[in-house]
Structure formats: structure tokens, C-alpha cells
Amino acid sequence: MDTYMPPLSVGEFLKGEFMIPLGLSAYKLAKDINVPVSRIQEILANRRKLSMDSALRLAHYFGTSDHYFIDLQTKVSLEAAKLVVKKEIESLPTYEETMEKGRKSRE
């Protein structure tokens, strides 16, 4: 049985893996990393992607690598994009296929 699960958003991950276990509110996190509360709220609500600035602030605050949060955002964005263009991408030829077609047309 193939069940579809949408990619976890950065906001869901941030909330579930960091904020809830540590008892952090959006207000406290925003205040501590010196960003507007609305920025954190929008990230949590999946209305805003994580910027480099936010990713670096979160990485410093939570003691992760500089790449941790931006890599997470990249993975989430990639999975979302794949869902949108999957069928079109699959219908495109590969480089090898175009080369083979070119060889056959010259024969």
C-alpha cells in the first residue's frame, strides 16, 4: 500500500524537535535570536521559507552546524518541487537518450 505523506515543513520540524521539547514559544525564540515574532510565526505556519539569516541564527542558538537548518529547508523545498513537476520531469529525455536518437537519425 503506497501512502502519500507530504514533506514535513521546516516549521513543523522546528516546533516538534526544538521548541516543544525545550518549552520555547515563538515570542521567546524570536526575542532570543533578535528577529520579529512574525518571522517565527510565519515559519511555523509554513507561510515563509527559512532565510539564510534565520538559518544561521537558529543554528547558533540551538548549537547545530551552520548548514543544519538551511540544509533542512533545501530538502523540504526540493521534495515539494518534485511533487509539482514529477510527471513533466519524468517525460523529459535524458542526455543519453538524445544522443542515441541523434546517432540513429544520422545512420
Stretch-by-stretch model annotation:
Residues 27, 38, 67:
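Key DNA-contact positions within bacterial/archaeal DNA-binding proteins
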Residues 1-24, 71:
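A short, Lys/Arg-rich alpha-helix, primarily the initiator
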